[in-house]
Amino acid sequence: MERPQLDSMSQDLSEALKEATKEVHIRAENSEFMRNFQKGQVSREGFKLVMASLYHIYTALEEEIERNKQNPVYAPLYFPEELHRRAALEQDMAFWYGPHWQEAIPYTPATQHYVKRLHEVGGTHPELLVAHAYTRYLGDLSGGQVLKKIAQKAMALPSSGEGLAFFTFPSIDNPTKFKQLYRARMNTLEMTPEVKHRVTEEAKTAFLLNIELFEELQALLTEEHKDQSPSQTEFLRQRPASLVQDTTSAETPRGKSQISTSSSQTPLLRWVLTLSFLLATVAVGIYAM
């Protein structure tokens, strides 16, 4: 087992986490697909898939936070009104998938792996929960508003914010000040050098779980590419933008647990755009933490 470094152990927890995750953070953000998102190339189908994964992830995270809200290893970071995203994501699921969204949203293998780890941490290693909360919530606060504006413009969504509740934190007036408060609370957590080391390692794991989501979509993209004949690929390249960014009328069948790779419903370009948005969600957000 890797022994904790003395210099990192003398740091505040917030600084130790930022330092420890630099390398894996670079892995998450250095992708050619980031350029697609920065250009506003976000499809509705791709966005729906990302939001469904986030719903499952935050549901698991917040179930474990509730379980450990009075545990001193997490209690100082309990900000349900300000931070919790499940209720907002339920609104978004209803917008994107309709009234029967609970039966319609996909639940991919990589998402299931992420959820499993969150439950393991909350159930048997609650002192590590801070790593996942830090990675997700501070990233959302840092990059969420930028991502919201890009997605809103790219998909011509209502200015009132329907479908984008996840990115809105109505109980936080000043994100910068709140992040300062959150870091200060993190630094009050009492932990041994060994526990601090495990927390920083778990933060790396959180990044790797997000990267696994990216790789899952990349695999789907590769499979989709192999299934495309030259004529089909050329047709996709020539499709007007209005057809690429279609409406949400083609819903996922109820009870479906895996993403369909049918070329008629999820063309090659959509997987590219989906992957770019996933990368941006983590990389742009956490970059500014």
UniProtKB/Swiss-Prot annotation:
UniProt catalytic activity: heme b + 3 reduced [NADPH--hemoprotein reductase] + 3 O2 = biliverdin IXalpha + CO + Fe(2+) + 3 oxidized [NADPH--hemoprotein reductase] + 3 H2O + H(+)
Keyword match Plastid: no
Listed PROSITE patterns: HEME_OXYGENASE
Polar residues biased stretches: 244-261
Description of what induces expression: Induced by its substrate heme and CoCl2.
Site positions per UniProt: Important for catalytic activity: 140
Subcellular location: Endoplasmic reticulum membrane
Principal subcellular localisation of the protein: endoplasmic reticulum
Post-translational events: A soluble form arises by proteolytic removal of the membrane anchor.
Residues bearing PTM Phosphoserine: 229, 242
Topological domains annotated Cytoplasmic: 1-266
UniProt similarity note: Belongs to the heme oxygenase family.
Protein name: Heme oxygenase 1
Origin organism lineage: Eukaryota, Metazoa, Chordata, Craniata, Vertebrata
